[in-house]
């Protein structure tokens, strides 16, 4: 049994615990029947529900872009392919740079990869779980949640996170290379050359974004917001056209991928958008309760990590929450100390969703890549913390020290 299978077994263990809690909550709660252990698992049933309810949000984000992937590849290919080939990189890296793996990046990467499976997975699941989500999701969502006064800390954190994405990608690529990733029994050939050469365009984009966040942070952040709105519009067009094609047979946009199984598809080998979403939700039934219960059971060690980083308890809790979903973390930012705000935003760039949506997506689409993706995301997140600690404004150092002393 490999590490990817072990991770799946662990999540299913937590899924069963959460299912028991949901059942017992109908009859007075888990504590009533299971005593001390029951009390320790109470609330996991609610996370069980959250995991399944995520299906709707996932569908809105994924279905339209998944259907549009071959169309976008056809339109963008003549421009993207020559540029990336000139840099010595596979064109699929474009997809993971701008799109999250679960917002079309994985499927667009496949269309642009030209048959190079390793490059497709490197972009679609490793890069597409770090840089893409930051640009199309995390920054726009954060701006709608955080206080305006915290935007400077968001910019500093994202800057720290962006520059360490290549480190996370290389780490994930090396794990994939040495773990012997296979698809349908066939080995996927990750090489040093592929891992390093495909980082060239990513490094260029990372440096440009970092410079923009350093010198024109407000304009850069507003630019991300505009891009995200454009993307939502594009996804909506794709979703509407795909539904019309499925229900009425009208092909409003030629070349759309089916969103349900089509004639010729082999069950178990080909999964269309709607089935992928269902598979992800099944994984989230265990992933969300797992994060809740691990946070509860290991609260003291996690708080000690916060003390080690010299941040308050809210900031430490935010980092743990980020591993499942960064939205709660952004909601907690106003209660964090300055250092905690920058560190949390930096950590979230790569590490967000590592034990949530991205884990579910990898498990549903390519479970051989679960471990490489998680390792890459965590290494990217941890190294981002190191950079963020150097970027905390010096004029806030006294405030950080005072806030830390107030907790002790």
UniProtKB/Swiss-Prot annotation:
Signal peptide: none annotated. GO terms for biological process: ethanolamine catabolic process. This is Probable ethanolamine permease EutH. The lineage of its organism: Bacteria, Pseudomonadati, Pseudomonadota, Gammaproteobacteria, Enterobacterales. PANTHER family: ETHANOLAMINE PERMEASE EUTH-RELATED, ETHANOLAMINE UTILIZATION PROTEIN EUTH. It catalyses: ethanolamine(in) = ethanolamine(out). Pathway: Amine and polyamine degradation; ethanolamine degradation. Disruption phenotype: Unable to grow with ethanolamine (EA) as sole carbon source. Slightly attenuated in a mouse model of infection. A double eutG-eutH deletion is not impaired for aerobic growth on EA supplemented with cobalamin (vitamin B12). Cells are unable to grow on EA at low pH. A non-polar deletion mutant does not grow on EA at pH 5.5 or pH 8.5, poorly at pH 6.0 but wild-type at pH 7.0 and pH 8.0, slight decrease in acetaldehyde release on EA plus vitamin B12. About 25% reduction in survival in mouse macrophage assays. Bacterial growth is not enhanced by exogenous EA in macrophage survival assays. Probably involved in the diffusion of protonated ethanolamine (EA) into the cell at low pH. At low pH most EA is protonated, and this permease becomes necessary. Contributes to bacterial survival and replication in acidified macrophage vacuoles, but not to bacterial uptake by macrophages. Expression of the eut operon allows this bacteria to use ethanolamine (EA) as a carbon, nitrogen and energy source. It relies on cobalamin (vitamin B12) both as a cofactor for the ethanolamine ammonia-lyase (EAL) activity and to induce the operon. EA enhances bacterial survival in macrophages in a concentration-dependent manner, suggesting it is an important nutrient during infection. It is found in: Cell inner membrane. It is a multi-pass membrane protein. Induction: Part of the 17-gene eut operon transcribed from a single promoter, induced by ethanolamine and adenosylcobalamin (AdoCbl, vitamin B12). Keywords: Cell inner membrane, Cell membrane, Membrane, Transmembrane, Transmembrane helix, Transport, Virulence. The chain crosses the membrane at residues 1-21, 61-81, 89-109, 126-146, 155-175, 192-212, 230-250, 274-294, 313-333, 342-362, 369-389. One of its GO terms (molecular function) is ethanolamine transmembrane transporter activity.
């Amino acid at each position: 049994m490999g590490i990817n299978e072990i991770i799946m077994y662990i999540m299913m263990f937590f899924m069963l615990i959460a299912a028991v809690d949901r059942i017992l909550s109908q009859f007075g709660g888990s504590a009533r029947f299971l005593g001390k252990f029951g009390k320790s698992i109470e609330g996991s049933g609610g996370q069980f529900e959250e995991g399944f309810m995520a299906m709707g949000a996932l569908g809105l984000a994924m279905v339209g872009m998944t259907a549009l992937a071959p169309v976008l590849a056809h339109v963008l290919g003549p421009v993207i392919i020559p540029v990336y080939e000139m840099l010595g990189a596979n064109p699929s890296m474009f997809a993971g740079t701008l799109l999250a793996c679960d917002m079309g990046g994985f499927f667009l990467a496949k269309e642009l990869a030209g048959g190079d499976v390793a490059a497709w997975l490197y972009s679609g699941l490793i890069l597409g779980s770090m840089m893409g989500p930051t640009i199309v999701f995390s920054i726009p969502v954060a701006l709608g949640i955080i206080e305006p006064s915290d935007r400077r800390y968001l910019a500093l954190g994202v800057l720290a996170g962006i520059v360490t994405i290549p480190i996370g990608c290389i780490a994930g690529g090396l794990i994939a290379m040495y773990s012997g990733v296979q698809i349908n029994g066939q080995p996927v050939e990750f090489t040093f050359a592929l891992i390093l050469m495909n980082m060239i365009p990513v490094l260029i984009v990372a440096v440009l974004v970092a410079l923009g966040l350093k010198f024109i942070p407000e304009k850069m952040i507003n630019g991300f917001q505009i891009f995200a709105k454009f993307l939502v519009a594009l996804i909506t067009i794709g979703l509407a056209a795909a539904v019309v094609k499925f229900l009425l047979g009208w092909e409003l946009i030629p070349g759309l991928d089916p969103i349900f199984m089509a004639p010729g598809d082999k069950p178990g080998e080909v999964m269309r958008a709607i089935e992928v979403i269902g598979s992800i939700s099944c994984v989230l039934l265990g992933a969300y309760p797992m994060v809740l219960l691990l946070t509860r059971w290991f609260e003291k060690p996690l708080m000690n990590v916060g003390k080690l980083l010299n941040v308050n308890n809210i900031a430490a809790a935010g980092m743990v929450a980020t591993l499942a979903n960064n939205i709660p973390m952004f909601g907690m930012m106003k209660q964090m100390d300055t250092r905690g705000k920058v560190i949390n935003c930096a950590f979230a760039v790569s590490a967000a969703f590592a034990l949530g949506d991205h884990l579910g997506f990898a498990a549903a689409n390519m479970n051989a890549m679960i471990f490489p993706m998680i390792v890459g995301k965590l290494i990217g997140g941890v190294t981002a913390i190191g950079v963020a600690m150097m970027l905390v404004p010096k004029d806030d150092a006294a405030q950080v020290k005072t806030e830390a002393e107030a907790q002790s």
